[in-house]
Structures are given as C-alpha cells and as structure tokens.
C-alpha cells in the first residue's frame, strides 16, 4: 500500500548559491535524495518524489510536477536501475529533458560564479 500522507508534505532546501548558503547548485534531485536520508523516509520511495515536485506545485496552485499527455515532458533520466541505486549516488551522469528534448546545457564553471554568493574566497 502506498505511503501517501493525508497532508501535502513537501521537502525544500536553500540549495542556491547565495550569501545564506554558498554551496548550492539548485539540484532538486539532491534535495529529494537528502530528504529521504535525513528524514528517514521509507518505501515506497517513488511516493516521496512528489514531496519535491508535484506537492510544491500543488501548494502554489500550479499544474506542474507530473508527466501527463500534452504536458511539457520535463524530466531527468539516470542509469540507476532502482530507487536504492538512485538514492545512493548523486547521478551526475543524468540526462535532463526539457520539453522532451535532451538539454546540452552544462552547469557554469565555478570561476563564472565567483562573487555571486557575496563572499570572498
């Protein structure tokens, strides 16, 4: 039986590169992965993925966060064969699809980000 809480449970993080948290990179998969670990969330892990995608979208009144016919087909593909593999490694070799097309965008180099967090190195 799925573990679907009776309330809209969400996991969030200040995972941005700013003066409050200069180590972030806006990686929602990392937020979900850390949430599962830190909050000791259990099977079925797929139910808890909603806590970082469709649950926040619902709270904001957005029709996003789920794949659906005619939707934008924004998703992440990984080599993981199951949820334990997905959650035990960062999956840095993932493929990001935007509107169904593989994105070739790469994260900026750290040199490009120098000074953005408001802290000197």
Model-derived features: positions:
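His/Asp/Glu-enriched, well-ordered alpha-helical/loop segment
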Residues: 1-78
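Active-site microenvironment of metallo-dependent hydrolases
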Residues: 46-121
